[in-house]
Regions:
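Metal-dependent catalytic neighborhoods of phosphoester/phosphodiester hydrolases
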Residues: 18-28, 44-46, 180-187
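Short, well-ordered alpha-helix to beta-strand connector turns
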Residues: 4, 53, 116-117
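Active-site environment of divalent metal-dependent phosphoester hydrolases
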Residues: 13-17, 40-41, 81-82, 105-107, ...
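Active-site metal-binding motif and surrounding structural segment of the metallo-beta-lactamase
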Residues: 1-38
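Active-site neighborhood of phospho(di)ester-bond hydrolases with catalytic His/Asp-centered motifs
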Residues: 4-12, 33-35, 97-101, 120-122, ...
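Short acidic-hydrophobic, aromatic-tinged amphipathic segments that line or gate anion-handling sites
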Residues: 56-60, 218
Length: 235
């Protein structure tokens, strides 16, 4: 944990901040990075110690900030939390874009995703599973909204649209436990690329396969992932 310098928070929903305070209380060198509006949302919505603020390091959308040797730019995403953001992370020549908990692909999301060699993007639900599943109608409507979550098929079309040889790793994240499975998400997202003739690696060893055009992985919902070694495609 000594090498970890900060925790970047996308928004104030409980599944994104639940363990942040317990981590920084134990490892006091770690800062909590979020927008001031997101911090206010966290303090308002959750039963959390006021000392949470002691670890706060503010940032603002579209204004780059630094954590150690990483340059980070937060950008707007469409979700129903408070001041929701994704992150564009730069380290040397490496570019990593993260967008999770978003109901649609906005121009700002697209702007940063197209610059990255590595992307982490939500692939939350399979539409048929959601519509025939046990969720109440109001919850289905929330998920389907433009400030809800991304359907596997939407993510698949978007990745197929933006793919270029420089894109080496795609991480699918925030998969629903009730309305999705890793196999369904991967099958849906990889199919358009297969149809275009691209070779897809699964990143199973945590390293880039030089036989594949791109590595696509579905990240686990509840467990830690393996450690991935990110290397840009030399194409």
């Amino acid at each position: 944990m000594d090498s970890i310098k900060g925790i970047c928070i996308t928004h104030d929903h409980g599944d994104h901040i639940r363990y942040a305070y317990s981590i920084v209380r134990r490892y006091r060198h770690i800062g909590i990075y979020c927008t001031p509006k997101a911090l206010n949302g966290i303090m308002r919505r959750h039963n959390i110690s006021r000392r949470f603020k002691d670890y706060h390091r503010p940032f603002y959308k579209e204004i780059p900030f630094e954590i150690d040797n990483f340059k980070i730019t937060a950008f707007e995403v469409s979700h129903d939390g408070t001041d929701n953001v994704g992150f564009f992370i730069e380290n040397g020549a490496h570019r990593f874009a993260i967008a999770t908990d978003l109901g649609c692909i906005t121009p700002r999301v697209d702007f940063y995703m197209r610059q990255a060699q590595y992307i982490m993007i939500e692939s939350n639900y399979d539409l048929e599973m959601l519509m025939t599943g046990k969720y109440a109608e109001y919850l289905k409507a929330r998920i389907l909204a433009d400030n809800g979550h991304l359907d596997n098929a939407v993510t698949a079309r978007y990745i197929s649209d933006i793919y270029s040889p420089k894109l080496s790793h795609i991480f699918l994240c925030h998969l629903s436990n009730d309305n999705n499975t890793p196999n369904i998400a991967l099958s849906t997202v990889t199919q358009p690329l297969f149809e275009k003739g691209y070779k897809i690696g699964d990143g199973s060893e945590g390293v880039t396969s030089h036989d594949a055009d791109v590595q696509i992985m579905a990240l686990p919902r509840f467990d830690s992932s393996i450690l991935y070694i990110l290397r840009a495609n030399q194409k």
